[in-house]
């Protein structure tokens, strides 16, 4: 297998789903490994980071990792207190994420390991830990260049655009793509024809702005938590319907799309049905976008012409 790849360790949103009916796609919360030779970028620290940490300890090949957090909702950080390398001397761990409190990123991480929520605090970490808050400019994480961008989700939340070896991977696990446009549609009846034309222009402008971060990406890993029916009931919760995610990736000129952050209530049968419906949506748009659902242990090479599951 290539030494430059994307591997999924956790693909669920909201909370872990360790159920027999969910094992084909997996039940861990978000964690995506970006292996770049002897360097490692980890997107988010949901429960999927726990088995990843155990594997890193067993392999003993890498001692320097970059953990890149989208935000601090439980499902994106709940595995970090169990990431074994953090407790081992000789490891260097760079942690990146938005600054949502006066104490910054370090404060956000420390809070979840304080009593009465956890038996030991971050002071028990023996690795060399450093904290970084991305700004408007791109930053380097080992051999990769990353750019943070804000997304539509409760609280301060980032997505990331990663470039390596001539390929671009976009990671946006929690992002409601069509909230503003759907809200405009709800109130169209209140306006006359001239105002409706202005609203349509606003919608198009908002749509283009909302998909700019995934423009021409080789691979987009994006929130697709809901079916259309569930999205109607949960609009404003900060997650996307898979239809909106597919349409946005196509409009942005992305080459491949990985539907991510599966609802923990969706079992394997439901996700198989969504996969078939997603294929139909891509076909209806008459595009060659490669679209697939994230699964735990799914691996995608940077070194292939197209970034597709192996």
Give the location of each predicted region.
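Active-site neighborhood of phospho(di)ester-bond hydrolases with catalytic His/Asp-centered motifs
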Residues: 42-46, 65-73, 97, 170-173, ...
